[in-house]
């Protein structure tokens, strides 16, 4: 039984808790969030505007959440180094704050007594692992990153296509649902002026490092992909549009067949495949990292194609976080 703690009880932290509770080999011991009191944590965990009510009993005793009779301690420390991870025998701390995402800052969890750390954000210093893509390269590193939700969608698809046909170069666009960093009405956003505009009333062009990060988990694609994002007024579920120049000519039928085969074999559970006339809400709660939309892609020539793949940027990603925790626990 692996003992875990969750730092940061936001969208990802709460969903990671939901998913972890359903895994027999994981015990969630504690959560920490300096901005959330225990009674508020109970409320936020119980009710979710996007994914619905938690299917179980949720209460608290003033110090801990009580979920279906099981206690989960709640702390409110700003500095992770002061958390009692040693006393609580924490094997893996999951950091979903978006703040402690580099080796030096995530080290605070180790200093507090945790054995390992999984960061739920891309990192420029911690090694990044994408389940289904490069998790076989995990060699016991103490602090790891689960990359971003968009990299988790793009990388499995890019791996399949590159292995079968070769990718010479490509551009990615993610049409991405709103996230917590955006504004309900126009407000100050000094680093990203467009990002400060009303989330619910605009299509907002934005930057993303997700495509370049694929080169970190698939070195053979280093320098071959880049991309951008459009933030759109949907609450959850996003879609990747990958336009690539192939090294080897292929028909669209051949591409579909290769992706379908991978989704049923080595990437089962990570890569999905559909030929249905789907829209974004059809993927709410989908646990795949990426679901290939066979009916949406187009081909211009034997070596130039646009491929489309959906992802629940909250739930699919959080599922992979827990998968990575299990992998780290085994090694």
Curated annotation (Swiss-Prot):
Give the residues annotated as active site: 149 (nucleophile)
Which parts of the sequence are marked as the site Activates thiol group during catalysis?
176
Q: Which GO terms describe its molecular function?
A: glyceraldehyde-3-phosphate dehydrogenase (NAD+) (phosphorylating) activity; NAD binding; NADP binding
> Which InterPro entries does this UniProt record tie to the protein?
GlycerAld/Erythrose_P_DH, GlycerAld_3-P_DH_AS, GlycerAld_3-P_DH_cat, GlycerAld_3-P_DH_NAD(P)-bd, Glyceraldehyde-3-P_DH_1, NAD(P)-bd_dom_sf
Note the Gene3D superfamilies from the entry: Dihydrodipicolinate Reductase, domain 2 (3.30.360.10), NAD(P)-binding Rossmann-like Domain (3.40.50.720)
Sites binding NAD(+) sit at 11-12, 33, 77, 313
Quaternary context:
Homotetramer.
Q: Which family does it belong to?
A: Belongs to the glyceraldehyde-3-phosphate dehydrogenase family.
Which PANTHER family does this entry report, sorted A to Z?
A: GLYCERALDEHYDE 3-PHOSPHATE DEHYDROGENASE, GLYCERALDEHYDE-3-PHOSPHATE DEHYDROGENASE-RELATED
- Protein known as: Glyceraldehyde-3-phosphate dehydrogenase 3
Organism per entry: Kluyveromyces marxianus (Yeast)
């Amino acid at each position: 039984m692996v003992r875990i703690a969750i730092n940061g009880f936001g969208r990802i932290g709460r969903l990671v808790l939901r998913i972890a509770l359903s895994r027999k080999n994981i015990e969630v011991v504690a959560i920490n969030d300096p901005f959330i009191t225990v009674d508020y944590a109970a409320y936020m965990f119980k009710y979710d505007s996007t994914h619905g009510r938690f299917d179980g009993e949720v209460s608290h005793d003033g110090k801990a959440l009580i979920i279906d009779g099981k206690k989960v301690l709640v702390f409110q420390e700003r500095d992770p180094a002061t958390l009692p991870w040693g006393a609580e025998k924490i094997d893996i701390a999951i950091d979903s704050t978006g703040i402690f995402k580099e080796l030096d800052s995530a080290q605070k969890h180790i200093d507090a007594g945790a054995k390992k750390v999984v960061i739920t954000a891309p990192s420029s210093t911690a090694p990044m692992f994408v389940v289904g893509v490069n998790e076989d390269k995990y060699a016991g590193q103490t602090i790891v990153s689960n990359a971003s939700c968009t990299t988790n969608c793009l990388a499995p698809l890019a791996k399949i296509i590159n292995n079968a046909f070769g990718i010479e170069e490509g551009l990615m666009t993610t049409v991405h649902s709103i996230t917590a960093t955006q504004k309900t009405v126009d407000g100050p956003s000094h680093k990203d002026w467009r990002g400060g505009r009303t989330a619910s009333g605009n299509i907002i062009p934005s930057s993303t490092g997700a495509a370049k990060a694929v080169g970190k988990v698939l070195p053979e694609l280093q320098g071959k992909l880049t991309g951008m994002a459009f933030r759109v007024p949907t609450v959850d579920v996003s879609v990747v549009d990958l336009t690539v120049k192939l090294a080897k000519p292929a028909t669209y039928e051949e591409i579909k067949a290769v992706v379908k085969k991978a989704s049923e074999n080595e990437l089962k559970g990570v890569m999905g495949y559909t030929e249905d006339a789907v829209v974004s809400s059809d993927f709410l709660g989908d646990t795949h990292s990426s679901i290939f939309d066979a009916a949406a892609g187009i081909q211009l020539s034997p070596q130039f194609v646009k491929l489309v793949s959906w992802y629940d940027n909250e739930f699919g990603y959080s599922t992979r976080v827990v998968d990575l925790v299990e992998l780290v626990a085994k090694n």
